């Protein structure tokens, strides 16, 4: 009996090892990442990794019953169920509504397993059918090959993204260089009028100098004009005024206040009035000969008193 039981265990272990050599059973049925799974849910008929086995245990034995391939002993019923199902047929039923080769997110693996087996969201039928009725498609590939193709696709996408980034950076560099060239051309075009204005500056400088020369010549012409000549009549008038006697000072008058000027002159003495008015007239004499005019009042010591002056001063009848 003991030998038969031990032989059964050994035969069951050999069957499980042979099942693990199949392509679809080399990768975990749930996460599809970890290879060489050493755990299994015998009622569901799937081989899983140690991480997913912990999630299966949390679902409860009414959903999944987990055993170790190496450490636990397997019965004939358990081994037969694993032989009937396997990862390929199990996923054909439990993931029927998912896209082929779907790989769940590593951070949401627990939610994925719970939704897959407990809520039965992606099952093919509400009732679990016989595994022999589930025929895998001819063009289906093992999960390991799918993962390899996914890795290749990811690498190609990353390389294409890198090439796109390099192309975009090269385009940006070209655009930047073009903008710099345009800005340099614009700056040169803006600086060219300044150069033209610099070349025209000497002509603008000569114009004020010419005007200054004209102004200086006009001023010099004014100063260089001949001085006006004094007419002969003005010279004769000056000589006449020089020969006339000058009025005497008030010291030789009478004892009365203001002397002979106390009474106003009558109309009959027109000669005296005209005589005293003569020095007050303005003649044609210019300021060019200031020394020709005699001072209106001179002292008694400058020249001798004439008889006419004494008559004018001492004669009282003249002022009547």
Swiss-Prot record:
Q: Does the keyword Glycoprotein apply?
A: no
> Could you name the domain of life of the organism this protein comes from?
Eukaryota
Give the ZnF (C4-type) ranges: 28-52
Q: Do you know which Pfam families this protein is assigned to? A: ArfGap
Against SUPFAM superfamilies, the record matches this protein to: ArfGap/RecO-like zinc finger (SSF57863)
Q: Which GO terms describe its molecular function?
A: GTPase activator activity; zinc ion binding
Any GO BP: endoplasmic reticulum to Golgi vesicle-mediated transport
What are the cysteine partners in each disulfide bond?
Answer: none
Where does this protein have coiled-coil stretches?
none
Q: Which UniProt keywords apply?
A: Cytoplasm, Golgi apparatus, GTPase activation, Metal-binding, Zinc, Zinc-finger
**Residue ranges constituting the Arf-GAP domain according to the UniProt record:** 13-132
Give an example GO cellular component term for this record.
Golgi apparatus
Q: Where is the composition biased (Low complexity)?
A: 154-176, 245-257, 295-310
**Per the record, where are the segments of Polar residues compositional bias?**
183-210, 228-244
- The principal localisation class reads cytoplasm
* Chain positions covered by the region annotation Disordered: 153-212, 227-261, 284-320
Subcellular localization(s) per the UniProt record: Cytoplasm; Golgi apparatus
* Function of the protein: GTPase-activating protein for the ADP ribosylation factor family.
Protein's name according to its UniProt entry:
Uncharacterized protein C824.09c
Organism whose genome encodes this protein: Schizosaccharomyces pombe (strain 972 / ATCC 24843)
């Amino acid at each position: 009996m003991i030998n038969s039981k031990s032989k059964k265990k050994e035969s069951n272990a050999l069957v499980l090892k042979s099942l693990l050599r199949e392509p679809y059973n080399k990768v975990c049925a749930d996460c599809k990442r970890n290879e060489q799974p050493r755990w299994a849910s015998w009622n569901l008929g799937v081989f899983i990794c140690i991480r997913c086995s912990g999630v299966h245990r949390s679902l409860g034995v009414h959903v999944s019953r987990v055993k170790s391939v190496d450490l636990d002993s397997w019965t004939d019923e358990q081994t037969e169920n694993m032989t009937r199902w396997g990862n390929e047929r199990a996923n054909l039923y439990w993931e029927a509504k998912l896209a082929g080769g779907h790989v769940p997110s590593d951070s949401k693996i627990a939610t994925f397993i719970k939704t897959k087996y407990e809520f039965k969201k992606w099952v093919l039928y509400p009732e679990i059918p016989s595994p022999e009725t589930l025929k895998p498609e001819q063009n289906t590939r093992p999960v390991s090959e799918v993962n390899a193709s996914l890795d290749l696709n990811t690498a190609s996408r990353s390389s294409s993204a890198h090439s796109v980034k390099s192309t975009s950076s090269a385009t940006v560099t070209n655009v930047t260089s073009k903008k710099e060239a345009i800005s340099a051309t614009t700056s040169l075009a803006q600086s060219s009028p300044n150069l033209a204005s610099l070349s025209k500056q000497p002509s603008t400088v000569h114009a004020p100098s010419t005007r200054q020369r004209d102004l200086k010549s006009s001023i010099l012409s004014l100063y260089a004009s001949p001085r006006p000549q004094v007419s002969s009549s003005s010279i004769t008038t000056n000589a006449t005024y020089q020969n006339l006697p000058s009025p005497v000072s008030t010291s030789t008058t009478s004892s009365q206040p203001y002397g002979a000027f106390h009474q106003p002159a009558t109309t009959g003495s027109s000669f005296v009035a005209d005589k005293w008015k003569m020095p007050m007239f303005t003649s044609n004499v210019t300021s060019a000969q200031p020394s020709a005019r005699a001072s209106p009042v001179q002292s008694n010591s400058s020249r001798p008193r004439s008889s006419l002056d004494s008559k004018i001063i001492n004669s009282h009848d003249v002022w009547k």
